[in-house]
Design a protein with these regions (language model features):
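Accessory carbohydrate-binding/adhesion or oligomerization-edge regions at the termini
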Residues: 1-72, 180, 184, 551, ...
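Accessory beta-strand-rich segments of carbohydrate-active enzymes
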Residues: 5, 12-16, 82-220, 247, ...
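Beta-sandwich strand segments
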Residues: 20-26, 186-198, 319-327
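Active-site-adjacent substrate/metal-binding segments within catalytic domains
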Residues: 65-93, 111-119, 123-130, 136, ...
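Structural beta-strand segments of beta-rich domains
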Residues: 113-115, 234-242
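Extended acidic/polar, glycine-enriched regions
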Residues: 154-155, 168-172, 241-337
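Substrate-binding/catalytic cleft of secreted carbohydrate-active enzymes
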Residues: 381, 387-594
Length: 594
């Protein structure tokens, strides 16, 4: 059974790159340096030099999420964000015992647990050391990654009865996790390589979790509800898929996967599959399990009544012992863009919305769950949005969870802004796209995948690959790709277009779709994904006349779009003001486009 706990408190941080003193397996760590009784120990065990002493004493204790530099509100030099930083946290035996106490040791051949660290987001790239050994490197500020760390830890340290095993020095030695973060705008990592009108800041700006498993574990869990016929008030099928991997020697052929579906705590249905009936992956002790369960007349997920079901997935051994457990939230709904608009549960809805950056004053990206939820509440309840576009990258899982709960639709897109890099850059973009879809495809709020780099030029080979990947990973959602040019090659299902034709003069508020769409796809679904924004920047403290004009521009454009049956929706730029580079904004490093 999987045990998972937040691992966000009690970290240490210092500016600069990782130095050799930190990468040794006998490093005492920054917490020891800040204890007065350990000052002498440190000077003896590390070095007598002031330089080595400073290497441990210039750390400060922090909690995650964290940004490496506290940003001024405005008028800063964005180059100050381009820096190195190190995070360190001691892995304590009590924490391991706590997360493993619920594991049934009888289910495992190996008595030691498999221990994982899961990072939700680190900007921009990082390397992770465990016990002085390099465990992982990761590129990209917006996608999660996971590391198995027990292989870097002595078994005698992991053993519960370690007082009787191993040398005294080995048992007493602390185990440190060190994360070196590089927030440079690396031209090999999307969205960088060209000019970008927003910042990525730097640091471990999302949460970290400590997980433990015994025997086997599930990954890439996905459940997609589909109606069995045209009627939505009849039977549905929930298609469930998962990858299951053995964590130790021994076969998992005879294991079974059980699924239970609940609504408001009441069991709706259950189903199971034997791994022996599943597909083995690449001759490894790994399986791809796929099965379905039926649900009669489910309560639909909708923008006004977002009903969420809990799906529990449990992996059992041949003897009936639980090896792993996960829980998903899913919603029963249909969503489709067509030539006459967008349809949710077969009902046409005009998609009124705004784009959103995930940043905040002073703390950059490092906002916790409550702040993420508050943004969703503002969009849905105060601004009247039906949809939000996650411009221009995958955003916080907490924000997406709130969208599920509030009934706020989401158009989520891969990282990027105008620039398409070379082969290595494109491979990283595809990797980001895959991570985004695998992470988020269980969210009922997401109705469209963005598979083009925002406002980039056509690139047939690259965008053929992004579309193919998205459709393979999720054949049930349509694809879109935000462009700013008319007659662009359309490889996606929906033509998503940034329309800034209105400059405050005349009555040409939006472009006519027939003049924008390629001639060979004149009836393609059509969605406006940006308008207004930089065409009329407005500060909250501007004079009333400008504030009114700003509101009227949004109103004119929305009114015109709603009156055109070919337009599925109209998403404005943007929900909130945001920090930018010197090339953009109002000269003080802020884009007042919210």
């Amino acid at each position: 059974m999987r045990m998972k706990h937040p691992w966000n408190a009690g970290w240490w941080f210092r500016p600069g790159k990782a130095e050799d003193a930190f990468l040794s397996d006998d490093w005492i760590g920054p917490s020891a340096a800040h204890s007065p009784k350990n000052k002498t120990i440190i000077s003896k065990e590390i070095s007598q030099t002031d330089d080595a002493k400073n290497k441990t004493e210039d750390w400060k204790q922090i909690h995650l999420p964290h940004d490496m530099i506290e940003a001024p509100f405005n008028a800063f030099d964005e180059r100050s964000f381009l820096r190195w930083g190190c995070y360190a946290k001691e892995l304590k035996k009590e924490e391991i015992l706590k997360i493993t106490e619920g594991l049934d040791k009888k289910t495992s051949i190996n008595r030691y647990p498999a221990i994982f660290l899961s990072f939700e987001g680190v900007s921009v790239s990082c390397r992770v050391w465990v016990n002085g050994r390099l465990a992982c490197s990761h590129k990209g500020p917006y996608t999660p990654f996971e590391i198995r760390i027990d292989t870097f830890i002595p078994h005698t340290w992991l053993e519960e009865q370690s007082k009787e095993q191993g040398s005294k020095a080995e048992r007493a030695r602390p185990i440190w996790v060190l994360v070196e973060v590089d927030s440079a705008e690396d031209s090999g990592i999307p969205p960088f390589g060209g000019v970008v009108d927003y910042l990525a800041y730097g640091g471990i700006y999302r949460g970290v979790s400590l997980c433990a498993d015994l025997g086997a574990r599930m990954s890439k869990l996905w459940a997609i509800p589909r109606p069995r016929g045209d009627a939505l008030d009849g039977p549905w099928l929930v298609h469930i898929s998962a990858e299951i991997e053995a964590l130790e020697s021994g076969s998992i052929n005879n294991c079974s996967l059980l699924a239970r579906l609940y609504l408001s705590g009441e069991l709706v249905n259950e189903g199971n599959i034997l791994l022996s009936d599943s597909t083995r992956i690449e001759e490894k002790n790994k399986f791809s399990a796929n099965f379905s369960m039926s649900v009669d007349r489910p309560k639909l997920w909708d923008i006004d009544s977002p009903a969420l079901y809990d799906l529990e997935l449990a992996l059992f051994s041949e003897m009936g012992q639980e090896l792993d457990y996960e829980q998903l939230r899913i919603g029963f709904r249909t969503a489709e863009f067509g030539s006459s608009g967008f349809y949710l549960n077969q009902r046409r809805i005009f998609l009124r919305g705004l784009d959103r950056h995930q940043e905040y004053p002073y703390i950059g990206y490092a906002m916790g769950p409550d702040g993420q939820r508050r943004d969703a509440e503002i969009l849905k309840e105060e601004l009247g949005c039906i949809i939000v576009r996650t411009s221009h990258y995958p955003q916080s899982p907490h924000f997406l969870d709130a969208c599920d709960e509030l009934g706020l639709l989401v158009f989520e897109e891969l990282p990027g802004w105008q620039h398409i890099g070379g082969r290595e850059w494109q491979e990283q973009a595809l990797h980001d796209l895959e991570d985004m879809i695998v992470r988020d495809r269980n969210h009922p709020s997401i109705v469209l995948w963005g598979v083009r780099i925002n406002e980039s030029k056509d690139n047939h080979e690259f965008y053929a690959r992004t579309n193919e990947l998205a459709r393979r990973l999720d054949p049930y959602r349509q694809t879109g790709g935000v462009r700013c040019q008319a007659r662009s090659e359309l490889l996606e299902d929906v033509y998503t277009f940034n329309d800034f034709i209105y400059d405050g003069k005349g009555t040409m508020y939006i472009s006519e779709p027939a003049k924008v769409l390629p001639k060979y796809r004149k009836r393609a679904p059509y969605l406006i994904t940006e308008h207004t924004g930089h065409m009329f920047p407005t500060k909250r403290f501007d004079q009333e006349e400008r504030l009114v004009e700003h509101a009227l521009r949004h109103a004119h454009i929305l009114d015109t779009a709603m009156g055109n049956s070919r337009v599925a929706g109209c998403i404005g730029w943007c929900a909130f003001d945001y920090h930018t580079h010197k090339d953009f904004g109002s000269g003080d490093r802020i884009c007042y486009h919210g």
